[in-house]
Design a protein with these regions (language model features):
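Conserved H-loop
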Residues: 39, 55-62
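Well-ordered beta-strand scaffold positions
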Residues: 1, 38, 72-74
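C-terminal boundary and immediately downstream tail of ABC-type ATPase nucleotide-binding domains
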Residues: 54, 162-177
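ABC-family ATPase nucleotide-binding domain "signature/switch" substructure
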Residues: 9-21, 29-32, 46-52, 66-164
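The conserved phosphate-sensing helix
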Residues: 26
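Receiver (REC) domain active-site loop signature in two-component systems and cognate sites
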Residues: 3, 35, 103
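ABC-type ATPase nucleotide-binding domains, specifically the catalytic core motifs of the NBD
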Residues: 34-42
Length: 177
């Protein structure tokens, strides 16, 4: 079904965007998470936080899911806010996801772990990941190299390495660092 033919409400339910800029709303952690799925149980909220690697900071919150966030409440770090946005995504369970540098604020090793967890949780969905970290591209079914606004290479990681073009040069440079 072409996207333009979908009713806006269905489109918003089936397609989700997560960027590197996230908003934490005034309210509890549970309130912020339930923006992804209004009727989610506390167990589902905890599972979503665990799926994105947020357990390390979440378990330290004295009031747990009832911790007040935002103005006058607990302040999340940028990486914690990014994990919160990803947990919302897990709860929303959309068919199609656009991840625009969605783990850029998380340290590279933790980001790798989060991406693997998301891969398992979001299996079977269409994911468009816009990333500058090459390990993200490595795990993709297909990689598009964009230069000056145009796709210059398209294929799997192995196919692009065999082409010995821009992607292969970036990969070799990154691996030698």
């Amino acid at each position: 079904v072409p996207l333009v033919d979908l009713p806006v409400e269905e489109l918003r339910r089936e397609v989700a965007l997560v960027t590197q800029e996230h908003h934490v709303f005034v309210g509890t952690l549970a309130d912020n998470l339930r923006l992804g799925k209004e009727e989610a149980s506390d167990e589902e909220l905890l599972a979503a936080l665990d799926d994105v690697g947020a357990a390390s900071w979440f378990t330290a919150l004295k009031d747990g899911l009832e911790t007040e966030l935002g103005s006058g409440g607990h302040t999340l770090t940028p990486s914690q806010a990014q994990e919160l946005a990803l947990a919302r995504l897990v709860l929303a369970d959309p068919h199609t996801l656009v991840l625009d540098e969605a783990t850029s604020l998380i340290d590279p090793q933790a980001a790798r772990s989060v991406e693997r967890s998301l891969g398992a949780v979001l299996s079977g969905r269409t994911v468009v990941a816009i990333a500058h970290r090459l390990h993200t591209a490595h795990d993709a079914d297909r990689v598009a190299v964009v230069e000056d606004g145009r796709i210059t290479e398209l294929g799997s990681h192995d196919e692009l390495l065999a082409l010995d073009g821009s992607y292969a040069a970036l990969w070799r440079s990154w691996r030698s660092e």
